[in-house]
């Protein structure tokens, strides 16, 4: 159910290297407080009134109760969402992370205004049926289409958003849909990583029992100042 070896390599820093996880300093302080990192994105929020929301929060609570919870910063429940297509973020101003028609020095406000104009009238599928496939490394729930047809619809939606926004990333096709529950703040020892893997299995088992499938949508264009809040600008349904 979970790629344990990849998770251990990530949690210990062997996969990416560096003194600390990439989110520290860019998205969060060393203590887990959010820092300013404005941008826009296209997402599906998880309905707070849904059984799926309660199941995700319960899985997050299992992780919070672990002995290594302080190594993570956990997302507020009302920010839980699944990204359809990543937009722009202020600290990532490179040609492969920025709309091809915009100068790299364009402000986030200008980039967001451009995105809203390009997506006006863009109609996404209204609902997406997805299923959880794993809890990876104690911080993210891997998601996939509930069926092959649903997975194909998700991928076609990503492709359409890529083309509308003129934002072509080299890793576009390898993207794994997910719901982020937390961010890692420090590298772990292998023993600590193994403990997180076991806790992730426990959380995944409970999550799959409570939420074998969920429906998300409609898609939204959202803006953010930090990773704690994603404000809807518009639905992508007309």
Short names for language-model regions:
Residues 1-238:
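Histidine-dependent nucleotide/RNA phosphoesterase domain, centered on the 2H-phosphoesterase fold
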